[in-house]
Amino acid sequence: MKHVLKNDWGPLLAPEFEKEYYRELDVFLKEEYSIHVVYPKIEDIFNALEYTSYENTKVVILGQDPYHGPNQAHGLSFSVQPGVKTPPSLLNMYKELRDEYGYDIPNNGYLVKWAEQGVLLLNTVLTVRQGEANSHKGKGWEHFTDRVIELLNEREKPVIFILWGRHAQAKKKLITNSNHHIIESVHPSPLSARRGFFGSKPYSKVNTILANMGEREIDWEIPNL
């Protein structure tokens, strides 16, 4: 599962692929993909980094592990492939977006438009076995994605980290550079959204920060497909 990242993440993350933890992860993944159905497809594992280069990252929305149902995951946190029903957490994200900006809820959950504008949609674990949430937890991905966060933390140009829920907020310890911004609330999951996600206005907070920095704001509206 070694991968040549075609943008500026390539040289930054190349040392990770040579480390012992990644070699063990690689052996595990080759076996998993050969005997089980694993998501996303091998060629989509690193899509978050492919769509959003290091230099172009303005915002990070941290997820946990990929969706584990058929045709959902394609390497971007919270996003699903076209033609697939919008999952409940993403639907709540859209409801909050509607309340903030008045956008209609789109007929899809395909968030590539965000990624192309500099929103890094990063899961902390990048693969999962079909139907088994967290099945690839603790196999090595966390070391890899922690390094992604650490590299962004080292950047002088500010990054806005959106941390929803305790799992994402546990990564706050990696964000030590005071140049960066953290926006946090409970998770948009139906289990917690009414306890502080709805009304938290994350999208307009991001754009206020970007505007104050003289950066182009994110156009959060997802078009119908």
Swiss-Prot record:
Q: Which reaction does it catalyse?
A: Hydrolyzes single-stranded DNA or mismatched double-stranded DNA and polynucleotides, releasing free uracil
Reported EC number(s) for this entry are: 3.2.2.27
The record's GO molecular-function terms, alphabetically, read:
uracil DNA N-glycosylase activity
Keywords assigned: Cytoplasm, DNA damage, DNA repair, Hydrolase
Query: What Gene Ontology cellular-component terms does the record carry?
Result: cytoplasm
Biological process annotations from GO:
base-excision repair, AP site formation via deaminated base removal
Highest taxon of source: Bacteria
Active-site positions on this chain: D65
Please name the PANTHER family in this protein's record: URACIL-DNA GLYCOSYLASE
Family classification: Belongs to the uracil-DNA glycosylase (UDG) superfamily. UNG family.
User: Which HAMAP family does the entry link to?
Assistant: UDG
Q: What does this protein do?
A: Excises uracil residues from the DNA which can arise as a result of misincorporation of dUMP residues by DNA polymerase or due to deamination of cytosine.
The name on file for this protein is Uracil-DNA glycosylase
Name of the encoding gene? ung
